[in-house]
Amino acid sequence: PSFAKAWYLKWAEKWVLSGYHYISVPFDRAKEAYEGLAPPTKITTIPQGVRLVDIDGALCRPNAVPTFCYAGIFYEHIRNPKFFLDYLLTLDQSFRFVVYCLEDTFSQEMLSSYKKLLGEKLLIKSPIDRESLIHEMAKMDFVINFDNDNATQRPSKLIDYAMSRRPILSFNCQTFRPEVFQAFLKG
């Protein structure tokens, strides 16, 4: 999703997809990604299934220092948080941004450069299992979702975010509004 496809892959995708009776996608806008590859009548929407996790309401309480988190992977071209981290550098107030992130090269190099600048305001954590993560997110004041910079892909983590029972702030570089973020910081 974060790089341009080679021209010949479209032919291979079309050939592979021709062998299926149906193609299922998790939400309607994802059908656009298959335009020209398969007839619209072959593409059906089947929402993702989930196992619900019960969260103890006692976990959900305000932190002394506004604390928020993101859990997932970053992509240089469709889910790049540099604009947000640059914004955080301008803040002259206490906060703690906890990031549970895969240890890929792009994410680690980018986050380590901001860690040097933000210090203890940025906590970088390795991925943990889904249920533990939902419990950790429940301890935050709110959670951050970086929307993809495209319309045909949507992060499945929003389901887990909702189970954490914490407010969700979603944005990308075009939709980020500092005044909305400040309102979340203030509770």
Predicted segments, located by residue:
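Acidic donor-binding loop of glycosyltransferase active sites
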Residues: 21, 137-152
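Carbohydrate-associated surface elements
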Residues: 29, 49
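Membrane-proximal helix-turn-helix segments that form the acceptor-binding/catalytic region
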Residues: 3-23
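Short hydrophobic beta-strand element within catalytic cores of glycosyltransferases
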Residues: 142-143, 160, 167-172
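Short acidic alpha-helix that forms the nucleotide-activated donor recognition element
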Residues: 15-18, 129-140, 163
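Conserved donor-binding/catalytic core segment of Leloir-type glycosyltransferases
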Residues: 60-78, 85
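Nucleotide-activated donor-binding/catalytic signature segment of Leloir-type glycosyltransferases, i.e.
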Residues: 65, 101-103, 108-132
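Short hydrophobic signal-anchor/transmembrane segments that target glycosyltransferases
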Residues: 81-94
